[in-house]
């Protein structure tokens, strides 16, 4: 199975996001990308929508519930939110939704900054492996992978999807 083209998915996501925001009568959402791939997707979505507002970025490393098991990611960077969260309509963007734990961590962090009016979740891919009841409002595509497979977004220019096989060589 070949992987979809991220640029095509983002174009369709922009159409779907515009319609979603219009239905909800949201006119000036604030975009927030989850590092790293979510930031790239958020930048591309903003470009497709002609939105030139500042982009917020989240690094959820300290908010993850598996922090004590997996340790700290070697490239932790501070979150940057160049706008107030309180009362804002947010578009939270991630590249790959798998378990839902990254989104849960992102929501926890956002609520530490204030109470948004709403949060719209936009994801490039859903791997249909959810452990938590989290679903995107706007989605590029759903992929079903074998348990030993993952997909990674590479970029930022060009954005590309890469399949990764986590199975030990002896298991193949």
From Swiss-Prot:
Keyword hit for Transferase: yes
EC identifiers of the protein: 2.4.2.9
GO MF annotations, alphabetized: uracil phosphoribosyltransferase activity
Name of this protein: Bifunctional protein PyrR
Superkingdom as given in the UniProt entry: Bacteria
Taxonomic path: Bacteria, Pseudomonadati, Pseudomonadota, Gammaproteobacteria, Pseudomonadales
Signal peptide as annotated in the record: none
Motif PRPP-binding per record, residues: 90-102
Organism encoding this protein: Pseudomonas entomophila (strain L48)
Function: Regulates the transcription of the pyrimidine nucleotide (pyr) operon in response to exogenous pyrimidines. Also displays a weak uracil phosphoribosyltransferase activity which is not physiologically significant.
PANTHER family: BIFUNCTIONAL PROTEIN PYRR (PTHR11608:SF0)
Family: Belongs to the purine/pyrimidine phosphoribosyltransferase family. PyrR subfamily.
UniProt keywords, alphabetically: Glycosyltransferase, Transcription, Transcription regulation, Transferase
Keyword NAD (UniProt): no
Catalytic activity, as annotated: UMP + diphosphate = 5-phospho-alpha-D-ribose 1-diphosphate + uracil
One of the protein's GO biological processes: regulation of DNA-templated transcription
Pfam families assigned to the protein according to its UniProt record, in alphabetical order: Pribosyltran (PF00156)
């Amino acid at each position: 199975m070949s992987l979809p083209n991220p640029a095509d998915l983002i174009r369709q996501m922009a159409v779907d996001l515009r319609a979603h925001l219009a239905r909800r009568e949201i006119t000036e959402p604030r975009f927030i990308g989850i590092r790293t791939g979510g930031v790239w997707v958020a930048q591309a979505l903003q470009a497709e929508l002609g939105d030139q507002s500042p982009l917020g970025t989240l690094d959820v490393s300290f908010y993850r519930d598996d922090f004590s098991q997996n340790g700290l990611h070697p490239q932790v960077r501070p979150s940057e939110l160049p706008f107030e969260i309180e009362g804002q309509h947010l578009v939270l963007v991630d590249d790959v939704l798998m378990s839902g734990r990254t989104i849960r961590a992102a929501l926890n962090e956002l609520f530490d900054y204030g109470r948004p009016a709403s949060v719209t979740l936009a994801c490039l891919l859903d791997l249909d492996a959810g452990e938590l009841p989290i679903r995107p409002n706007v989605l590029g595509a759903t992929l079903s992978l074998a348990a030993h497979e993952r997909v990674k977004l590479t970029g930022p220019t060009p954005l590309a999807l890469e399949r990764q096989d986590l199975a030990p060589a002896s298991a193949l």
